[in-house]
Amino acid sequence: MGLSLMLLASCGGGGGGGGDSDGGGDVNSDNDTTPDVADQTLPFDYPPLDLSKIEFILPLGGMIGNHVTPIDHQYYVAPDFGANETIVIDVYSPAAGRVSSIQHMGNFDNDDYRIVVDHSTTIQSIYIHVDSLADKLSPFAPTNGQYVNTDIEVAAGEIIGSYSGSVDYNLVDYDITLPGFVNPDSYTAEPWKIHTPDPFDYFNDTIRQTLLAKSLRAAEPIGGKIDHDMDGRLVGSWFRENSNGYAGLDPNNYWLGHLSFSYDYIVPDHIIASFGDYAGEQRQFGVLGNAPDPADVGVSTGLVKYDLVSYEYYDGATPWDRSSFTQGMTMDNYSFIDAVVLVQLVEERRLKVEIFHGQTSADVSAFTDDAIHYVR
């Protein structure tokens, strides 16, 4: 597995917010995704970390392993990620605020912290996989696997910790509700998720240009996108019927009921079919022919067959090494078919699905009694 894919897979369950949820004041559900310029914290005049030391930024929206639906945080990756990891990178508070919580993630042998900084009543910065805390924060550090609420004032640009390898960052803006989640009630387990826009738009132009130049994604929004739902269409994320939405039925494997027909986070014209339960595993595939576009599949379309295939990223004519910076990548599917998945939108928000392992679209013509229903 490539380094960047190992990186995604290593980020444990809970998504960008991770751990315990953090409220963010009043929620405005007007679907306006433009930052509120009247907010005196904006634009941010400091980056989230020392950008001069990173190799690249993995944008929002990746899908890998048990991250079945698009990931709600970015990854800021050092050049030596996965090697000796001797490069230490400072993490900053991009604007003045208060550290409202610190969590020890407890997933690894070394210290691994999640930090939430409230910049206003509605805007937060969230970091995961911070290796060490700044002196101001370290007296409040929880023990392994624990979580503490705090109220620690930090200045704009103040160092709050450091990391080696990679850190997760996302921004939450509770004044914004992303329009590509057609049923926000399915995300109550991670309430920040529907309020997680592209962070790049929140920084001053000088910093924003540096962020844009470091992202592996060349298409707008360059910082990534996690909301792909269209009402009455296949595209976007789904949850197995009666499985409690994003939360699932078991917090230890909440992703089992997840399903997504979305777009790749780096090359967004490439369709990704992402499964929380693919013969007991969590798997992602391209679809043979990269068609039909799930945005074009509606109730009137009827039965659709997707042949599931592996895929590769290309930097020019060469497969991307998954560890060095580049932009303008393309993707290509392999020809070997792992399975065929049948899908049919039986109602605008109800989807019928069945996977036929080891078979192709030529082998299968109809659902069996093993078909499963998913809802938004």
Language model regions located:
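Surface-exposed, glycine-biased beta-strand/turn segments
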Residues: 24-113, 133, 155-156, 196-200, ...
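Zn2+-dependent peptidoglycan hydrolase active-site motif and core
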Residues: 94-146, 167
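Bacterial signal peptide processing site
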Residues: 12-16
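C-terminal motif of bacterial Sec signal peptides marking the signal peptidase cleavage site
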Residues: 8-10
